[in-house]
């Protein structure tokens, strides 16, 4: 059974804080089943985006799986914002969590699909 989105996000925010990063909900989506996008800002001007993995890459052993969007690279923050705006136009119930970390860590651990 999958955790409700709101609970997963709260736990993720705590994980980021425990590791010395600042994380905040930039867009609050559906509490029960909204998709979550993670934006990691490094150095204030560049960002990477992590998106929910497609259904075929989902694994029963993990609550949620992630893929690196935008080629898995840090891009100018305005490009990351434009990509997220496109996602919002498709899904108005999605969440966006922004993480500010000097090292650019995403804190998704093994849940990231390479």
Please identify what each model-predicted range represents:
Residues 1-114:
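Polybasic/polar functional segments that serve as interface/processing modules
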């Amino acid at each position: 059974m999958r955790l409700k989105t709101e609970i997963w996000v709260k736990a993720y925010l705590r994980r980021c804080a425990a590791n010395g990063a600042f994380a905040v909900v930039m867009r609050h989506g559906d509490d029960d089943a909204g998709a979550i996008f993670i934006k990691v800002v490094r150095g204030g001007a560049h960002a990477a985006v992590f998106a929910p993995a497609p259904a075929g890459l989902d694994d029963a052993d993990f609550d949620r799986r992630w893929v690196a969007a935008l080629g898995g690279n840090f891009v100018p923050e305005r490009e990351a914002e434009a990509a997220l705006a496109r996602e919002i136009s498709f899904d108005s119930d999605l969440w966006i969590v922004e993480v500010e970390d000097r090292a650019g860590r995403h804190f998704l651990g093994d849940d990231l699909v390479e």
